[in-house]
Amino acid sequence: MDNNYKVDEQKKGLHFNIYNYIWGGLIILFLAFLYRINCIYPYVTDDFDYSFIYGETTRLEGIHDIFVSQARHYMEWSGRYIVHFLAQLMLSMDKAVFNILNVIHYAGLSTLICLLSTKKIHLHIWLLILLTLWCIMPQPGATVFWLTGSFNYIWAAGMVIAFTVCLLSQYRPLNITALFLAIPAGNTHESLVMGVFVSLVLYSILTKKKNKLHIIALLLFFAGVLSNILAPGTFQRLQTAGVQGDSGIQALCIKCLVSVYKIIKGIFSTSCDWGVQVCVVLFIITSVYLIRKVLNKKQTTTDILALCFLFGALCNVCMILPTGLTYGRVLFGFCFLSYLAFCVAFLSKLLLLPRYLNLIILTSTVVLCSIPCINAYATVSIFAHRMKYIESCAKKGEKTIRDLPISEQITHRYVDTSCMFPNENQNHFAALYFNTGEFSVLSPRIYQIMEEHSQAMQKMPPDEWVVTNENHVIYCLKEKPKKSEILVDAFGSTSSLDKYLPQFIKNLHKPGRRHTIINLFTMHGKYFATWDMQAPTGKLIIHYNEKTQPQEVYFNIEEQRCSK
């Protein structure tokens, strides 16, 4: 009898070890996938900006430069000095350092969520979190893989969860650690930390926590929140987004209602990031489950914590309503706290299920998550190839670069498509980063776009018309320019270009405005000029260097920086 019992116990232990090896192998495989994605994901948009001292064209060369940059950044653009300091620190190093640290941080964040949900590390639950967290976050390309974006979102979440775990721990040393994490965590991201703060305060009230360390840590966390929200740069950024402090309560309420409408409409739109839709479903499921438990008076302290996180998720939505911004990653705070509430409410229940049900859940999760993994790798690979192509063209001296047709396969979920067609950041700082002259990128469908717009164009004088596309003004010229060189002074005169460009484009030449290179081409016998209105000011010298191709004539443009 005893021998049979020992054999049964040995078999159980053997099965346990086998499953642990499987889970461990899948964890290593997934982390290797994340590392590979990080390696091929290129620098884009803000990565170029933050490689320089803010407001200057001087490359970062040390910690002192980062402090100078962040002091100016805090006053002029954003109060998130912690995450942006870390981003600039990483950008001053080789990207290989970030590639490794980002994977380690993601694994650490998943571990903290596991601890918050089940109090211990269980490999199969840790694997579930690793697979699903990045997958259902809005725009993981911008919130997880993109260097600057990752610090603003997933790293911010990591610091906030580290603070939360330490704060709620029963061990005094961790409570003391929470005091040191409080201000940095509170400063990370305003649309995330406000919801977390409300959640933790509400949880403290409902569970009647009176620990002095707990209260002090919350006050320090709120101080970090205020250091972000009340930063001079935060108000400047809000004004840029169209939020005016003196616009009146009525106008602000209307704007909030419009934002609510946009969010609800966006959730049901086919173009909505499906990660946001999944998080909305998780929010609803968790809310129904917890409300039923509360009504039946069967709630536990864990259920109360999950309910507080749900309330915090709604607070995060309220934080963004006045801005009018409702696109994918703006909803990161809502999505993350909804996901966290779901994990806290349900993951511990998996430990009570039979082994075969856990196997079914894990197998289904692995299969389902492999699909976005494949899509992410394919999309990021295409995007990386595109950025290398643009860099190589810029280094060859090309001023106007027609994008690769394959770029149209890139979707916004796994890549930040706001950087697809260069604006001020790309045209200026990318050129500085690549150590090339200014350049502009046109859509691979520029000629098809012109044809599509030709029937619904903005009418100008006879035989002239203007359309706008991808930040470019496209203007149909009356005739082919005759001079071999035309000088355009961004601070006043337009010399020979007067007869070819309409007055509203010529008026763009004013001090403080930003413009870019003009690209001239022909299509079906007509001549067109394209103008990107967001690139740096300066003197534009247009050299005609015709390369005759079917229905196309390109004119290369060079720019000379103006010292004014």
Task: Outline where the language-model segments fall.
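Membrane-interface junctions at the ends of membrane-embedded or membrane-associated helices
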Residues: 9-18, 167-177, 204-215, 291-302, ...
